[in-house]
C-alpha cells in the first residue's frame, strides 16, 4: 500500500529573510518536517515525498541548499519538480548528486512502486510565470504511461491545467493543455493529476481524471473570486497532502502546525 506525501510551494528564501516581506518560509518548512516526523508512526511507512514546485522564491543556490538542509531532516526519499519561481539550471546543479535529477533538458522523472507509478513533469518556462509542456515532456508522459501497465498512476505538475476562479493565478496556469488532456484520457487504469502553484486545496475534473491542487506549506493565495481582484497572500495555516493506495488513490490533508490531541471521543 504505497504512500506518497506531497509538499508544495515552500518558497524558501535566504536565511533570516521573509518571503514577500511577510512569511517565514524556512520556519514553515521546518515545522512541516517536524510534523511529518511526529506523526510518521501513525501514518507510515511513507514511501516518498514529492515537492510540486517553487522550492525556492528566487532560484538561488543558497536557497536550494537551505531547502535541502531542511527537507533532508526527513528520513524519507524525496524528489521534486520546478515551479515558476525556480531556476531550472541552478536547481539541476544543486541536485546533481541525486539519482533522479536529469543533467539537461526538462526536469521530468518517473518512479515505479509495486502498486503505483508516479510520473512528474516539468511545466516551468524560464522567465515566465505561466506553465507549458514541451514536446519532450509530452513524449516522456506517453512513454511512462505505456510502461505503467494499467496500475494506478499519479501524474504531478507544478502548474494546474484548470481554471480555479482566482483570476490572477488562472492567467499563470498551464497553457495549451489539450494534448495533456488527450494523453491522460487514453490511460486505462486509475489516474490522478496532482499540482501545486495555487497554494490552496482544490479538487476538480480535468477531462476524465481527478485533478487535485495542493495547499502551500507556509501561506495561501487569497481566495478572492471577484473579477479584477488583486493578487494577494493570506497567512492561512499551511498543509500538506498524503496520497495512498487504498481501494484506489485516496488523499488526506494534514496541517503543518502542531495541534492538540488526540482525545478519545468516549473516555472511560
Regions found by a protein language model. Give the residues of each.
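Active-site neighborhood of phospho(di)ester-bond hydrolases with catalytic His/Asp-centered motifs
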Residues: 6-8, 48-54, 78-84, 122, ...
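Active-site environment of divalent metal-dependent phosphoester hydrolases
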Residues: 13-15, 57-62, 84-91, 126-129, ...
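His/acidic metal-ligating clusters that form di-metal
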Residues: 32-48, 130-210, 241-242, 249-250, ...
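Binuclear metal-dependent phosphoesterase catalytic core
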Residues: 26, 30, 35, 183-185, ...
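Extended active-site neighborhood of metal-dependent phosphoesterases/phosphodiesterases
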Residues: 61-143, 176-189, 229-245, 250
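N-terminal active-site segment of His-dependent metallophosphoesterases
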Residues: 1-66, 106
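Active-site-proximal beta-strand elements of phosphoester/diester hydrolases
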Residues: 2-14, 115-125, 154-156, 209-215, ...
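Short glycine-enriched, charge-decorated loop/helix-capping segments at active-site entrances
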Residues: 18-24, 97, 127, 166-173, ...
